[in-house]
Amino acid sequence: MKKTPLDTKRLAKIIGQTPTVGSEGVVTFEVPRKDPIRLGGTRINPSLNVATTVAFEPLGSRSAVVVDFGMVSAEIQGLIALMRSMGWQVGCLYNQETDEYPQLYWSYQFKAGDPYALAQQVRKGLDRLDLDA
C-alpha cells in the first residue's frame, strides 16, 4: 500500500470498508449497495462504477473529501438534505445508465476540514442508504 499521512485504520473503522491509497496519499473507499445491481439484465460487480466512492485527499492537518453517493430515488432527498445541513457542497445530481436495476442516481459532494470529523459526517450519509457497510 502506498503511503499517506492519514490514519487509514481509523478512517476504515468509521467508513466500514478497507481503503486503497493512491497517488499523493489519497485514501479511497468503495462502498457497495446491499441490493444486487443489474445492467442490461446481467448482475455486475459493484466495482464497475456502481458503488459509493469516498476519497480523502490529505492537506496538511486537514483533508479535502469528495463523496460520490450512489442512491435509489427514494434516498435522494433525505441524503442531500442531511449533507447540506452539515455544510457539504452538493456538486451535482445525475444518473449515468439507462438500463440498470435498480435505477441509480449519483451526487458528488465536497467538504474540507478535519478528516476524521468529515468521515463521521460521511458515515451519517452512508447510514441513510442501503449499503453494505
Residue spans of the language-model regions?
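Long, contiguous binding/interaction regions
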Residues: M1-L104, F110-A133
